[in-house]
Amino acid sequence: MLELLLLHWPTVLLAAIPLIGLLISRNWKSGDVDFKQYAHFPQPEERDEKRGHWPWIEKSAAVGDPRRSFDIILYEQVQKLGFPPVLLVDWRPMEPLLILFILDNTVAEQVTKTSKQFSTSIPKHPAMQDLAPLVGSRSLVTLDGDEWKGLRKRILPGFQPQHLLSLVKVILDKSKLFIEHLEKRAELGEEFRVDELTTNLAFDVIGIVTFDMELNAQIPGKQSPVLLTYRELSHAYIARDVTKHWLRRYFTENERKIRRLDKKLDVILKENIQKEHAKIIRGDATASRSVATLSLHGIEKLTPEILQQTSDTCRGFLFAGHDTTSILMQWAFYELSRSPSALKALRDELDEVFGPDPNPSAVTKQLLGPGNGDLLNRLKYTDAIIKETLRLYPPGTTARLAPQGSGTTLTLPNGEKLVVDGLVLTPRALIIQRDPKIFGETKDDFVPERWLGPEAANIPESCWRPYERGPRRCTGSELANMEVKVVLACIARRFDWVKVGLGELDADENGQRILNEKGYYKTKSEIFTVGLSKMRSCRLSGSIHANLFFLSD
């Protein structure tokens, strides 16, 4: 249905963790699975003894555009199946494992909440460690249990509300370059990839926030060694052949490259961390207020363990912190381009809060003042746009594994209890956040107003989980939302965004856009999330507002 425009590979990777993990899971599990114990679980169709549910997967994928992601394929099938609360899929012969897709908010809560048995919720799937080159093996993303608790406690000061407000200046400073790039494209009328601009902006912000380093992602030819190394490492990771056993991959040239770049990045990050810690110890007033530096306060000795945790956590934020924000911005631009009522409501709110001057500099001047927190808090409709965008297009998911013999039990809405030991448990936010029981006939529509007024109270909190929920909810989610809010405040009245290619707006014989019965502009084709990362292009052409066109191939 919906193709994630300009989707970056990291988000695809996160969304596919439950699947990719199975390709490498021989590192952690081998042997046959006794499927009889799960025979009573909801399944899409009868399982083939030799091929599991792959016949169903292949049939489902064949009905529609082959580029669409597995989440979209799953969503299509779940609707046909009547929205079961869970769905068990046998992944043989890929691997002798089962995936339990969690499709109901009440069941998902049981997976992500704490319990007497699991103090930080059900553990992450071991396949998460395969992401170590990108997110670190000792980071918030990959750790579990008490070590995760201790690290999270150290990291939290960098994400407190008052500290986040102090970062508005950083966001505005980096957004200035972003806006300049848009202005240049508008003047030249060039086609360009908007994901490059949004991703570079997000990189620049997360670099300052995480370890107070200028990554210079938006300045060609001046990118920092951290950024260049990380991107080279990312490309090498993407080139990894995950269908091969890890031992067969280990001696390949690409794996040697990954290990070399992994070590290089680790050395650079640790050198920066050690310098900041030394400043703290000697009481140097120039010590930064970055997440990494704040996490080191009160630590007299920088042990190898703490140094590695901090380095890996910086890497994890570099990975997750840039892509989530970039994707969110792109989807918001697209939805506003096809919803004239939402765009008008947003612009009216910005006029009311910042005054009628649409120039980004006028907004920037006010947000640099002491009352920026109050100004941002008044942007209720902007908040609703962000929340609705994340509802329709959640940036990631989670994959958990209930240990064998743990007796982990999930209770379905009808009271039935399922013992899920040994299963991969993955709540699918894209489906949960489109539950017709909660969101009704507008489940697939962009309706920011649903989050405003009395009706918002009818939406259970657990039905909105784009950053997941529970103690392992994405730590930087509020930073991402604030960054997008600031960007929208600066540019929403300056630029018009129009999609071309897949999802392009339709027009009548006079070239005028056509409103459908729901008040959205009609499109020539539907847009859907893709299963592989494919960069898209955009074009800006100058007018009173610059018109940004997203171009799909």
Model-assigned labels for residue ranges:
Residues 2-6, 529-553:
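C-terminal helix/juxtamembrane-tail motif
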Residues 2-137, 141, 146-150, 165, ...:
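N-terminal membrane-proximal hinge/A-helix region immediately C-terminal to the signal-anchor transmembrane segment
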Residues 61-82, 362-414:
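Conserved cytochrome P450 K-helix E-x-x-R motif and the immediately C-terminal K′/meander segment
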Residues 120-132, 166-329, 345, 350, ...:
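Cytochrome P450 heme-thiolate monooxygenase catalytic core
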Residues 324-337, 487:
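Short, small-residue alpha-helix embedded
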Residues 340-342, 460, 477-529:
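Cytochrome P450 heme-binding "Cys pocket" and the immediately downstream C-terminal segment
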Residues 346, 389, 422, 446, ...:
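Hydrophobic, well-ordered secondary-structure elements that form the walls
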Residues 427-455:
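Conserved cytochrome P450 K-helix/beta-meander segment immediately N-terminal to the heme-binding cysteine loop
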